[in-house]
Amino acid sequence: MFVLSIALLSCTTLCAATTEWWGDLRAHLNPARQAPFYDVTYDEKVNVCPQGLHADAIPEYVYFGTMLATMTVDEHDQCLQKCAEKPRCKAVNFFHPFAYQEKGFCELLTEGQLDNPSLMRPFRKATYYEKIRCRELDDVEDVEEAAPIGSEITEKLPEDMAREKKLDMSKLMKKLSAKVKEFNGGAGGFRAAR
């Protein structure tokens, strides 16, 4: 009995256990089903942001941080609008309504994922929004404005592109045939199975 208790005591001193949340270290093993995206909403009823709202969205994730307020809303843009009206609001969790529900659930947050990234967790039927702001006219850029003035953009003709592909393909075939000859000819080639 004494030997058994000493063995158990020595085993417990060597073993250590920790508890980790799913999102802390293994979140990369469960990638989001949808990629993050930019969200732009328009609401003609509210004059706070006449050009609409602009936000960064991360679907199927929520932030479990300090909440400013909670409410039920019909659409996610109402949730974003409430956040834009409150200066302390930095981010929003929007929980989409289930089949039996008519309204979604909104959480206004006083901090975001950049404040504490470990508080981001995967969560189905929810979307995390951050960087919520009024959309400015400068947010929309034309293609001509995006290119620098001094840069020269030249487009290749389809004939040139086809010719380059043929040249690349012929170079590849030459290299491949040289490697096959080297493999077959050098070092005895293939050996018969014994």
UniProtKB/Swiss-Prot annotation:
One Pfam family named in its UniProt record: PAN_1
This protein's UniProt keywords: Disulfide bond, Signal
Domain PAN: 49-134
Highest taxon listed in the record's lineage: Eukaryota
Record bears the keyword Signal: yes
Cysteine disulfide links: 49-134, 79-106
Signal peptide: 1-15
Name of the molecule in the record: Uncharacterized protein B0361.9
Organism name: Caenorhabditis elegans
